[in-house]
Every structure is written in structure tokens, then in C-alpha cells.
């Protein structure tokens, strides 16, 4: 058995990636989220495949086909809710994974980090298009509002929006192409995840101390396979608790009303995992400025390694940076809350303040804190 594992070309690749992979001996449970993201992607692809067998991407029947899946298809309701809530779990793991990377300085692995940011954009695009497919009120108006943002691009904006819509409004052509893209993108995400892993295995994993662990490595199996298995059990327990007890907790009631272009919902808002970016978009009165802030709120992750001048990558021994980090987390939670509130005072001013603080912490306070901590090290 050992010979096959170490000699067969395919088995050898798996062996080097998941079995005999040298891993730091001190990585904590924060390193579990990579494997959990892989599990979430598998759940989404499998449930999505079964949903696609019964879904019709036509404006007249899309809403009815989702209702049909829930009512008439054998176990259709659980497949539909696993897919919808699986997306929420995906984003929870994604945010935890990025948060760990920021805290422990994993952004110093530039290729791995930048592929990760591309993955984040791709997952966000996939989730947005998936939200349009049930063709409820929030699906339709969410698609209209978000795609309309591209019209803010000077000179070519209007043509670009009409090209994406496939007409002069969000209609059948839009729904059909969104379904096609939503189907193919998860496989592109899987390929990008492979590249992400490839770059990670070039450098080896980071660890909480931020110190090189080359002198102290242990094999990935059985130590971290068992550890990952615990994460898998907890994730599945959380997901099934959500699906079986309160499947609509994270959804919007408006999406149980079929799409009606003549009736605008009082508050158009995306799924909870986009609310922080939506709050940043809404906090700027100018359309183009809002779109740029929205894109930059995610793209800013690629800039994090540039002003990083600290002697230590990890924040484990840097209390000032830790304070800033948790301020950033609190700020993102405030932005998420504001994104779900109506556009009226005091929410407008809170959203604008939180947006300024978000960029101020990342672009100005974090680099300054790095310099200050370097000075303190010399004392």
C-alpha cells in the first residue's frame, strides 16, 4: 500500500498534498477553515447540480420551478435549503479564513494571498448570480440595482449594462446567462483553489508565532486530518441545525413574492454577507464614487502586504496591532448592520463614519502602528 501511495503518479500527488505533507506542529483551529471551504464548495456543487436538474431559467417559470423543487421533488426542500444556507456557511468560513490570514500575517505569501483575493471576487460574483435565480422580488431588484452600478463607468457604462442585461432591462436573457455563469463558476473556483494550494505548498504553511517552523514539522496525516474532521463535524452540525430548524433565518421575506418590475420593494438589500460592501457603496452620495469604494473595499486586501513594514508578520506578539485588528472587525460588523438598515438618519451618518474608519485603519493606522512597533522593539 505504501509503495502505491508513494509511486503511482496520481496517488503521489495526493500523498504530497494531504498525507505526507510537512505541517507546522503548532497551527491552531484557525487553520481549519481552508479545508472547510473545500467542503462547502463540494456541498454547493453537489446540491447545485441536483437543483439544476429541476430548475428552469425562464422568467415565467423560474419562481414556480423553485416552488416545485420544494414541494414536489423528493427531498427537494432540504437540497434547496442546504444550497441557500450552504452559501452563508461558505462566507462565514471565508471571512474567518481571511481574518486569520490578516491576523497571523499570511499575506506575506504574495501569490497565495492574491489568488485568494481573486477567489473571493469569484465567489462573490457566483453568490450574487445565484441570488438572482429564484426570481423573487429581491432577486429581480437586487440584479437591477447591482448591474446598474456599471452604468457609472464613464463613456461605455450604459452600453456595458445593456450588454450584460441582453436587452434594455433585466429580463429572460439576463436570467439565462446568470444561470449559465452560476453553473460554470464553481468549477472555475475549484480550479483556482487548486492553484491557491499549489502556491501554498511552495512556501509551506504559516503558524501562529510567525516564526519559521522548518525545524519542527509533523506529517499532515493523521494529526491534521483528525483535527480537520472535528471542524467538518462542527460545520455540518451548524449547517443542518440552520437548515432543519430555521431555514429562512438568513433569507429575505420579499424573495417569496414573485418578481414584479412594476413594484419596487421598500428596502432593496443583498444577502447578509454583502451588507458590509453595500453599506460602503451607499455611504457615498456620488454613483461613480460609490462603485469605486465598493470595488476598493475588497481590492484593498491586495494592498495590505505593500505598507507592511513590521519586523514580525504575525500579530501574536504585537498588542497595538491586535487592538487595531479587533477595531477593524467591530467596524465591519457595524457596516454589516448598517447595510441592512433603511437609508435615513442616524444610519446614513453611522455608515459614512464606519466606511471612513474602515479605509483609515487599513491604509493609515496599520502602517503607522507597524513603524511604531518597530521603534518599540529597539528600546
Curated annotation (Swiss-Prot):
Q: Can you quote the record's cofactor note?
A: Binds 2 heme b groups non-covalently.
What quaternary arrangement does the UniProt entry report?
The cytochrome bc1 complex contains 11 subunits: 3 respiratory subunits (MT-CYB, CYC1 and UQCRFS1), 2 core proteins (UQCRC1 and UQCRC2) and 6 low-molecular weight proteins (UQCRH/QCR6, UQCRB/QCR7, UQCRQ/QCR8, UQCR10/QCR9, UQCR11/QCR10 and a cleavage product of UQCRFS1). This cytochrome bc1 complex then forms a dimer.
Q: Which residues bind a ubiquinone?
A: 201
Which cellular component, as a GO term, is one annotated location?
Answer: mitochondrial inner membrane
Q: Which organism encodes this protein?
A: Paragalago granti (Mozambique dwarf galago)
The organism's lineage is: Eukaryota, Metazoa, Chordata, Craniata, Vertebrata
Q: Which domain of life is it from?
A: Eukaryota
Q: What is the protein name given in its UniProt record?
A: Cytochrome b
Q: Which residues cross the membrane?
A: 33-53, 77-98, 113-133, 178-198, 226-246, 288-308, 320-340, 347-367
Amino acid at each position: 500500500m505504501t509503495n502505491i501511495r508513494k509511486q503511482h503518479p496520481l496517488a503521489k500527488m495526493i500523498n504530497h498534498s494531504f498525507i505526507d505533507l510537512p505541517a507546522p506542529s503548532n497551527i491552531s483551529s484557525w487553520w481549519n477553515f481552508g479545508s472547510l471551504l473545500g467542503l462547502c464548495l463540494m456541498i454547493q456543487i453537489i446540491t447545485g447540480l441536483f437543483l439544476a436538474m429541476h430548475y428552469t431559467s425562464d422568467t415565467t417559470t423560474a419562481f414556480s420551478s423553485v416552488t416545485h423543487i420544494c414541494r414536489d421533488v423528493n427531498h427537494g426542500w432540504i437540497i434547496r435549503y442546504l444550497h441557500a444556507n450552504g452559501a452563508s456557511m461558505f462566507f462565514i468560513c471565508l471571512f474567518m479564513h481571511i481574518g486569520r490570514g490578516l491576523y497571523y500575517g499570511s499575506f506575506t505569501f504574495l501569490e497565495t494571498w492574491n489568488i485568494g483575493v481573486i477567489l473571493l471576487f469569484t465567489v462573490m460574483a457566483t453568490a450574487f448570480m445565484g441570488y438572482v435565480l429564484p426570481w423573487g422580488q429581491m432577486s429581480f431588484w437586487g440584479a437591477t440595482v447591482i448591474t446598474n452600478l456599471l452604468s457609472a463607468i464613464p463613456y461605455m457604462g450604459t452600453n456595458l449594462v445593456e450588454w450584460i442585461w441582453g436587452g434594455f432591462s433585466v429580463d429572460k436573457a439576463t436570467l439565462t446567462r446568470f444561470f449559465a455563469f452560476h453553473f460554470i463558476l464553481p468549477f472555475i473556483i475549484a480550479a483556482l483553489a487548486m492553484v491557491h494550494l499549489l502556491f501554498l505548498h511552495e512556501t509551506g504553511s504559516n503558524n501562529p508565532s510567525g516564526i519559521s517552523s522548518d525545524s519542527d514539522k509533523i506529517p499532515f496525516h493523521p494529526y491534521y486530518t483528525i483535527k480537520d474532521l472535528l471542524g467538518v463535524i462542527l460545520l455540518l452540525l451548524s449547517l443542518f441545525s440552520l437548515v432543519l430548524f430555521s431555514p429562512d433565518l438568513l433569507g429575505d421575506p420579499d424573495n417569496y413574492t414573485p418578481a414584479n418590475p412594476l413594484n419596487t420593494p421598500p428596502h432593496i438589500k443583498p444577502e447578509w454577507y454583502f451588507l458590509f460592501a453595500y453599506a460602503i457603496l451607499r455611504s457615498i452620495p456620488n454613483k461613480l464614487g460609490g462603485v469605486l469604494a465598493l470595488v476598493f473595499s475588497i481590492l484593498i486586501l491586495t494592498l495590505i502586504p505593500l505598507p507592511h513594514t513590521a519586523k514580525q508578520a504575525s500579530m501574536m506578539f504585537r498588542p497595538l496591532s491586535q487592538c487595531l485588528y479587533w477595531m477593524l472587525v467591530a467596524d465591519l460588523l457595524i457596516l454589516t448592520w448598517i447595510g441592512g438598515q433603511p437609508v435615513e438618519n442616524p444610519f446614513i451618518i453611522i455608515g459614512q463614519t464606519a466606511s471612513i474608519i474602515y479605509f483609515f485603519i487599513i491604509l493609515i493606522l496599520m502602517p503607522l502602528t507597524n513603524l511604531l512597533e518597530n521603534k518599540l522593539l529597539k528600546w
